[in-house]
Design a protein with these regions (language model features):
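Short glycine/threonine-rich loop-to-helix capping motif typified by GTGT followed
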Residues: 4-6, 136-141, 169-179, 204-214, ...
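Glycine-rich and small/hydrophobic secondary-structure elements
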Residues: 179-186
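Short glycine/serine/threonine-biased micro-segments
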Residues: 82, 107, 123, 161-163, ...
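Glycine-rich beta-strand-to-loop/alpha-helix junction loops that act as flexible
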Residues: 130-131, 160-169, 197-200
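Solvent-exposed alpha-helices and their adjacent loops that cap or buttress functional pockets
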Residues: 27, 47-49, 75-79, 118-120, ...
Length: 336
């Protein structure tokens, strides 16, 4: 959300982007732009190079393909992003395979055996991303795996990007250990070190307001909402996970249990496992929490389900400001 960039600029040194579109948006942030993608296209690279500070490649083949473009840009304009490669530490503690970047055979990052005997001249950075919603103890063990598998590369590079997945804003996150890990690594290797807060920058933010439209009788009744799990919060079905609804408990915690049904025609557009102290009513509003990260960015216009307006709340003034409204033109123009 570029509308909150002024707030984010106070805390972040830049953005990590996946491809051209995110890089262009990151440029609007006004600070460092670091770009990584599983693969780049030449016509995209012409636009990425001028606006990027670091550029991480997913393979040696990609690095070698685009190294001449980087060299040419340096000669022509005096600027080229610092090139690095993404490696696979082959150390995984992520429990959900969908989000495990170090699973066996994963396409993300280069294994150490594929670097043996290779000419690594010109590679200035090492990038790894192995965490997902995890604490600093996992990073500590992952760093040890990187040091064990990639010592030659670590000696050579100027910077190391330790990727995302760090839940640094979670209340029980061990920030002191994170600081020790980063300081110890920098003192040992003498490199510039980066981490990507990612989700942590928006953890526990964003509320999705739903309204009960109908209630379908069944052994476990279904409340039909004016939102959709598959269109508005697909991560709840893909991961899957049970989102938090204010005032709702787990099954058996309260006397009235419901499923939450979405507005699409997908039979599985349903969320399970909610109980309430009182029966739900048609017209009643339900508030889903923690709906900003990995939710808004993955929304779809499937089935023409309308998108909710986006508003920003200022607690100092207790005012809401609507920054985006969606309508039929957005649905129509998405495809053709």
């Amino acid at each position: 959300m570029f509308s909150v960039f002024p707030i984010m600029r106070e805390y972040l040194s830049g953005c990590c982007a996946s491809g051209l579109n995110e890089a262009l948006l990151a440029q609007e942030f006004g600070k460092e732009v670091h770009v990584y993608a599983p693969a780049f296209k030449a016509h995209e690279m012409r636009d990425i190079i001028p606006i990027s500070h670091h550029l991480s490649f997913n393979s040696l083949a990609q690095f070698r393909k685009f190294k001449p473009m980087l060299d040419a840009a340096k000669v022509a304009s005096g600027h080229a992003p610092s090139p690095g490669i993404r490696v696979n530490p082959e150390h995984s503690e992520v429990e959900v395979s969908l989000y495990d970047p170090c699973s066996p055979g994963c396409r993300l990052g280069i294994r150490s055996d594929l670097l043996e005997g290779e000419d690594l001249t010109g590679i200035e950075g090492l990038h790894f991303h192995a965490l997902c919603e995890q604490d600093s103890d996992v990073l500590d063990r992952t760093v040890a795996a990187v040091e064990k598998r990639f010592p030659r590369l670590l000696e050579q590079v100027q910077w190391v990007n330790m990727g995302g997945g760090h839940h640094i804003t979670r209340k029980d996150y061990d920030v002191d250990l994170l600081i020790r890990v980063l300081r110890t690594f920098r003192e040992k290797w003498g490199k510039d070190v980066y981490i990507e807060p990612g989700e942590a920058a928006g953890l526990n933010t964003g509320y999705l307001i739903a309204e009960v439209q109908d209630i379908i009788a069944a052994p476990t009744p279904t409340a039909i909402l004016d939102i959709s799990a598959t269109a508005h919060m697909p991560d709840t079905l893909e991961m899957p996970y049970r989102p938090h609804i204010f005032g709702a408990g787990l099954p058996g915690e309260h006397p009235y249990e419901y499923k939450m049904g979405g507005m699409s025609c997908l039979a599985g557009d349903v969320l399970h496992g909610f109980s309430f102290p009182e029966p739900l009513r048609i017209g009643q509003r339900l508030v889903f929490a923690d709906m900003a990260h990995y939710t808004m960015v993955k929304t779809t216009t499937f089935n023409g389900v309308p998108h909710p307006d986006i508003a920003i709340y200022d607690p100092a003034t207790q005012e809401y400001r609507v920054v985006r409204k969606f309508g039929y033109p957005d649905f129509r123009n998405k495809l053709s």
